[in-house]
Amino acid sequence: MDKKIILAIESSCDETAAAVVVNGREVLSNIIASQIDTHKKFGGVVPEVASRMHIEAVDSVVKAALLEAGISIDDVDAIGVTYGPGLVGALLVGLQYAKGLALGSKKPLIGVNHIQGHISANFIEHKDLKPPFVSLVVSGGHTFIVHVKGYRDFEVIGQTRDDAAGEAYDKVARALELGYPGGPKIDKLAKQGNKDAIEFPRAKFQDDTLDFSFSGVKSAVLNYLNKAKMKEEEVNKADIAASFQKAIIDVLKTNLFLTCERKGIKKIAVAGGVASNSCLRETLLEEGRKKGIEILFPSPILCTDNAAMIGSAAYFNYQEGAVSDLNINAKPNLKLGER
């Protein structure tokens, strides 16, 4: 098999990342400069701050990725970069840097959809994984169920119509005064609570769609807290966290396994930051055992934003001749499968 080396850059939100990936599955380096400690002070990501920090970090992160991989830019076959979806200012930093690098080194440039990147993290973790399978992509900014028909062939089966699951986690964590990022904090606190203590709503649409809505459960938690505050009642934060988390995961589980049933597929690959959630993992693995469906997860380092997953996706794009020209622009609202 021909060995193809991809240098990948990711800067769609609050991580500046670069990686070197061979043939879409072998990671030689995966460098991440996280901005989380900075944004924590603001209770969420501040786009202008994120862009400035990407500018400060991108050059050293890319150089560190090449150094750790033990290669130079001359050894690279192509440069992969996230061009959407994400924060436009943040995306532009990585994209402009990658363009300059591609121009200077005369290497092909490959634009990558960030969601495709998350799905591709499973190709790194599970070396024998091949399409078709169903993927659940669940993170702070995205919630999708995708029928992965090929390495670049995606059918979106369900998506959120309002808040992403991870976004709801962050907002509820803020209301519970747990801090940012909210996902890991709610996951940890929920272990001490009773998941059946409070019946929070689960949104279901009448039109037979497998779309999601998480604004209702988020609002229900906020209303519950406001009522308790007005009555000057004590609340059990662990019970709230556990009950909220169960409501979110119940809906994800139901729609995900319905997709498998409708498509006749027996393999699920979960991806995105929320894929690190211990309750989600346990729930899906248990349901998978009952239904005879294989459930795959990436390692936690490959769940959150990273460039290795972008390198994997870029490789499969490159193999199918999907090379970008230097006029490619950042697309903050890029759809999965959009060319």
UniProtKB/Swiss-Prot annotation:
Q: Which residues bind substrate?
A: 137-141, 170, 183, 187, 277
**A Pfam family annotated for this UniProt entry:** TsaD
Q: Which UniProt keywords apply?
A: Acyltransferase, Cytoplasm, Iron, Metal-binding, Transferase, tRNA processing
Cofactor binding note of this UniProt entry: Binds 1 Fe(2+) ion per subunit.
GO cellular component terms attached to this protein's record:
cytoplasm
> Which positions bind Fe cation?
114, 118, 305
Its recorded reaction(s) are:
L-threonylcarbamoyladenylate + adenosine(37) in tRNA = N(6)-L-threonylcarbamoyladenosine(37) in tRNA + AMP + H(+)
Q: Kindly list the places in or outside the cell where this protein is found, as annotated in its UniProt entry.
A: Cytoplasm
Q: Can you provide one Gene Ontology molecular function annotated for this UniProt record? A: N(6)-L-threonylcarbamoyladenine synthase activity
E.C. number(s) listed in UniProt: 2.3.1.234
One GO-annotated biological process of the protein = tRNA threonylcarbamoyladenosine modification
Q: Which cofactor does it need?
A: Fe(2+)
Domain of life per record: Bacteria
> Does Lipid biosynthesis appear among the keywords?
no
- Entry function: Required for the formation of a threonylcarbamoyl group on adenosine at position 37 (t(6)A37) in tRNAs that read codons beginning with adenine. Is involved in the transfer of the threonylcarbamoyl moiety of threonylcarbamoyl-AMP (TC-AMP) to the N6 group of A37, together with TsaE and TsaB. TsaD likely plays a direct catalytic role in this reaction.
Query: Its family?
Result: Belongs to the KAE1 / TsaD family.
Q: From the Swiss-Prot or TrEMBL record, give the protein name.
A: tRNA N6-adenosine threonylcarbamoyltransferase
Source organism per entry reads: Clostridium beijerinckii (strain ATCC 51743 / NCIMB 8052)
Q: Which gene encodes it?
A: tsaD
